[in-house]
């Protein structure tokens, strides 16, 4: 069984409903969890953080990111969401900045939590092994929730 399929089985075994998935991203893939399970997702991956405290302008969307070793997501930001991440398997690198200039990468380990503001530039990086990151999208515009197209790629290793 592939690492991706094994991860999906593990997530489902915790009682989560996977509503969509994409294992064909050049950097790895993701699982989208049913939004009605946001609090259960927080209980499992964010130490029970009350999801009501995360709401900025609308709903919350939980996801699992699966990052391949040595792969870099695009240097990017979003117009209609902030994000909160928690590394729950492996370690990963993250670069953050309030401008288009990339800062130095910092390494995050299992259990580390990261809060990204709307518009903050960021890049998630796989290191020596696969990394799993729990992510909650904090939609900032309740009338126009964020989606996979809400991404401004400042730099991308894959020419997207």
Language model feature labels by segment:
Residues 1-60, 74, 106, 151-160:
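A short, N-terminal "cap"/entry segment at the start of jelly-roll beta-barrel domains
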Residues 60, 80, 118-120:
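Short, surface-exposed coil-to-beta transition loops
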Residues 62-66, 84, 105, 113-115:
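Conserved hydrophobic/aromatic beta-strand scaffold that supports enzyme active sites
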Residues 69, 79-99:
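Glycine- and acidic-residue-biased ligand/ion/polar-headgroup-sensing regions
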Residues 74-76, 85, 94-96, 115-116, ...:
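Short beta-strand His + acidic residue motifs that chelate non-heme Fe in jelly-roll/DSBH
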Residues 81, 93, 100-102, 131, ...:
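Short, surface-exposed beta-strand-loop junctions and turns on beta-sheet-rich folds
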Residues 98-119:
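Short acidic-glycine-tyrosine-enriched beta hairpin
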Residues 123-160:
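Double-stranded beta-helix
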